[in-house]
């Protein structure tokens, strides 16, 4: 029974039907609504908890994949052999969303100005191209690319110009690929890539076959050949000189040779610069004595290699994984807590059955990139990665490849492109260096009239004059070698 104070004023219809009046305290509507809200909240919490628990493993894997090149960097089977199809699809959605978010991000005022100017230059370049003024069009295309190097429209149109006007299908395909990594839904870039991808792959394969032919020609020269022995000795000095030079060492080639031959100090140079050269010497001797003949390369081998690289510079850090976070330009390597896992994965990849089916140059270049991307050490990552690359090449019958220090900017540019999604330009760069090294060996051991391969030049006129010389005599050979040893200039 309701008290008088609780009595409501029921509608007349309810009273006529004889239904007893409801008290406010007995009204079921608020209680029912309250129960529904509780059920909804509980259901939402349960669904969220289930989703979080079921996706924890995938999220952890995605976090680990952030630290190593993804399928957009390397071949899918290189990195995703341990993941299911569902996880791969989830990662693809994760990647595509992150790309879309980055494309949709707001630009700074300066970036907006550059993009506006770049698109204007792009329209002018297309008009000039249609008018037959190819040279002016090329300069404007390059200007647009410099202003907006990651704008899909600029990459796409410049790629089309390179493909159809310059007949440079390899570089055109590279720009189409870049456009797709930035804008995966770009139908024009996708159509262009479908047209060029197979052609470019065929060209790359033919290039590798050519390298194999030159390697076989070099392998046919007997070890007792005096010219070959001299070329190997010279290449040894060159390799150390250029590898430490890439990292900023200021020693000249003559000074590097003097330190290695006499073990005497060079006036005016720091102790660290001396020790960097001696460390590389120790590491290369370790490769020749131990690693070239090994079947598998292990983490321990890489640590021993690094221990020698830093043996004279920083013996405490040599052969040890870093314990702090490092930053390399725009690249943020994985944290120290992730290094053990990533290096174990790297070791498995190095010795996997699939890796053994890769062409030696591809395999060595990929190993170089993977290791430098993990960046497991405080210092010496680049030198150790290049030494590992040459170890793998030497096991396949190739000579140690020289990456000239004058190519430092290109070297880092191609590594940056790999970080952005396309490893192929870096592999081609390593193939270029491999071919130049092979050409020098073959020329040094040949008495047949042929064009002289020039690896380094100081000025264009001298480079052209020397490159045009046929069948050089002894004096000419000597002058060319001195010219090469000067250590300045660029790869033509």
UniProtKB/Swiss-Prot annotation:
Alphabetized GO MF terms: AMPylase activity; ATP binding; Hsp70 protein binding; protein adenylylhydrolase activity; protein homodimerization activity
Gene3D superfamilies: Fido-like domain, Tetratricopeptide repeat domain
UniProt keyword terms in alphabetical order: ATP-binding, Hydrolase, Membrane, Nucleotide-binding, Nucleotidyltransferase, Repeat, TPR repeat, Transferase, Transmembrane, Transmembrane helix
UniProt EC number: 2.7.7.108, 3.1.4.-
TPR repeat windows: 118-151, 152-186
Disulfide bonds: none
Listed InterPro entries: Fido, Fido-like_dom_sf, Fido_containing, TPR-like_helical_dom_sf
Membrane topology of this protein: Single-pass membrane protein
Biological-process GO terms, alphabetical: detection of light stimulus involved in visual perception; histamine transport; protein adenylylation; response to endoplasmic reticulum stress; visual behavior
Motif (Inhibitory (S/T)XXXE(G/N) motif): 243-248
Main location: membrane
Domain Fido: 297-432
Reaction(s) the record says it catalyses: L-tyrosyl-[protein] + ATP = O-(5'-adenylyl)-L-tyrosyl-[protein] + diphosphate; L-threonyl-[protein] + ATP = 3-O-(5'-adenylyl)-L-threonyl-[protein] + diphosphate; 3-O-(5'-adenylyl)-L-threonyl-[protein] + H2O = L-threonyl-[protein] + AMP + H(+)
Listed Low complexity bias regions: 1-17
GO cellular component: plasma membrane
Subcellular localization, as worded in the UniProt entry: Membrane
Residue ranges crossing the lipid bilayer per the database entry: 33-55
Domain notes: The fido domain mediates the adenylyltransferase activity.
Protein name (database record): Protein adenylyltransferase Fic
Taxonomic source organism: Drosophila sechellia
């Amino acid at each position: 029974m309701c008290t008088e104070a609780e009595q409501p004023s029921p509608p007349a219809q309810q009273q006529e039907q004889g239904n007893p009046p409801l008290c406010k305290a007995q009204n079921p509507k608020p209680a029912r609504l309250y129960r529904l809200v509780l059920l909804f909240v509980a259901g939402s919490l349960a669904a969220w908890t289930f989703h979080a628990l079921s996706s924890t493993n995938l999220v952890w894997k995605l976090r680990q994949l952030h630290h190593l090149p993804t399928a957009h960097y390397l071949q899918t089977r290189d990195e995703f052999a341990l993941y299911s199809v569902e996880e791969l699809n989830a990662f693809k959605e994760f990647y595509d969303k992150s790309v879309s978010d980055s494309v949709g991000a707001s630009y700074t005022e300066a970036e907006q100005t550059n993009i506006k100017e770049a698109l204007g230059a792009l329209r002018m370049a297309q008009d000039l191209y249609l008018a037959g003024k190819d040279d002016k069009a090329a300069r404007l295309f390059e200007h647009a690319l410099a202003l907006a190097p990651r704008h899909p429209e600029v990459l796409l149109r410049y790629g089309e110009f390179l493909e159809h006007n310059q007949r440079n299908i390899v570089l055109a395909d590279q720009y189409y690929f870049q456009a797709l990594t930035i804008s995966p839904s770009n139908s024009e870039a996708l159509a262009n890539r479908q047209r060029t991808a197979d052609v470019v792959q065929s060209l790359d394969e033919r290039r590798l076959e050519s390298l194999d032919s030159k390697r076989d020609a070099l392998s046919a020269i007997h070890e007792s050949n005096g010219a070959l022995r001299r070329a190997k000795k010279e290449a040894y000095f060159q390799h150390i000189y250029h590898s430490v030079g890439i990292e900023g060492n200021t020693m000249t080639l003559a000074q590097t040779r003097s330190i290695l031959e006499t073990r005497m100090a060079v006036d005016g140079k720091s102790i660290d610069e001396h020790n960097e050269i001696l460390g590389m010497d120790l590491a290369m001797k370790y490769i020749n004595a131990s690693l070239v003949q090994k079947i598998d390369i292990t983490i321990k081998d890489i640590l021993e290699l690094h221990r020698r690289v830093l043996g004279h510079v920083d013996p405490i850090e040599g052969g040890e994984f870093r314990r702090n976070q490092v930053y390399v330009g725009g690249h943020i390597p994985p944290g120290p807590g992730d290094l053990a896992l990533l290096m174990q994965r790297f070791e498995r990849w190095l010795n996997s059955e699939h890796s053994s089916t890769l062409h030696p140059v591809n395999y060595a270049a990929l190993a170089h990139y993977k290791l430098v991307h993990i960046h497991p050490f405080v210092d010496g990552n680049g030198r150790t990665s290049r030494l590992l690359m040459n170890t793998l090449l030497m096991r396949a019958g190739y000579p140690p490849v020289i990456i000239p220090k004058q190519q430092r900017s290109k070297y880092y540019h191609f590594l940056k492109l790999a970080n952005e999604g396309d490893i192929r330009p870096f592999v081609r760069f390593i193939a270029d260096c491999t071919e130049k090294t092979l050409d020098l060996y073959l020329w040094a051991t040949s008495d047949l009239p042929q064009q002289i391969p020039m690896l380094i030049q100081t000025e264009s006129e001298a480079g052209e004059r020397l490159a045009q010389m046929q069948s050089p005599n002894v004096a000419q050979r000597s002058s060319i070698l001195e010219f090469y040893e000067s250590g300045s200039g660029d790869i033509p």
